[in-house]
Amino acid sequence: VTEEQRFEQRIAQETAIEPLDWMPEAYRKTLIRQIGQHAHSEIVGMLPEGNWIARAPTLRRKAILLAKVQDEAGHGLYLYSAAETLGCAREDLYQKMLDGKMKYSSIFNYPTLSWADIGVIGWLVDGAAIVNQVALCRTSYGPYARAMVKICKEESFHQRQGFEACMALAQGSDAQRQMLQDAINRFWWPALMMFGPNDDNSPNSARSMAWKIKLHSNDELRQRFVDNTIPQVEILGMTVPDSDLRLDETTGHYRFGAIDWQEFNETIAGRGICNHERLAAKRKAWEEGAWVREAALAHAQKQQARDAA
């Protein structure tokens, strides 16, 4: 039995692939791309929310938002560690993102214009992320699957916090309800785009599904998200900006309108509303934080030398 046949056998049996196991080079590269982009999304995702920490309406909301952004930093570090088990360095992954050679989730290139946007990001954006990530808890690569289990627990808490913030606005004044509706109108379609292109236009899906890196297609996950979310929109007394949305009585699924893939393609090509601003902020943080990384490394080397002596 060749190494490749043994690998395929393990995938078929749903036995986790671990870092020291043999794996095809293309499998390793696919994982580095996916986990790296996932990590970048957590790190860049801190920016739109960080924008409101100093302007949160109450001390309680500020404490919640601080904790949430801190969680996202932790998720990013966790995922970079998972990627490093595949033999790449996080510095290289980060540099590729800064150079535009690796992507992050398109949703984070939209601005947060009001406090309602923060609630809607927690509810809709983290809600979409959870649909994606719960499926990844059974992905074929062990370190990635285990990272996802921890991250999903925290993300589901973020989503409940987001919905609670939206509920407070939905029960508030007319101006607050209008602010919430406006945020939903702006984030609904970008949230649906988070699942990636339609299955017939997704270049990496078939390979990823054959290797069980992905267990469900983009369109399946998008449908699941819509089915989960529309009843929540109704509880809030809000609507989504889709005149084609309707419940299909025979299937029990919601039918929704066509997504503007032109907007998605422009955003992932680096021409979205905030792409330039997001990368500039990350580049500045990377350069200004260099002394911290150098100091931590020097300290670790000193400790190591002391322990060796």
Where are these regions (language model features)?
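Acidic, low-complexity proline/glycine-rich segments
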Residues: V1-E18, H40, D92-M102
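Internal, conserved structured core segments that host functional sites
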Residues: F108-Q161
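Conserved alpha-helical segments that form or flank metal/cofactor-binding pockets of metalloenzymes
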Residues: V1-R6, A63, K68-K96, G162-M167
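Alpha-helical scaffold segments that form or flank carboxylate-/histidine-based iron centers
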Residues: Y27-H38, A56-H75, I118, P143-E155, ...
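Glycine- and acidic-residue-rich phosphate-binding/metal-coordinating active-site segment common to enzymes
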Residues: T139-P190
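Helix-loop segments that flank and shape redox-cofactor active sites
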Residues: W22-Y27, G45-A67, A129-Y144
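Extended, helix-rich structural scaffolds rather than catalytic motifs
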Residues: Q178-A309
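Acidic/His metal-coordination segments adjacent to aromatic residues that form catalytic metal sites
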Residues: A16-G36, K96-G122, T139, G172-Q176, ...
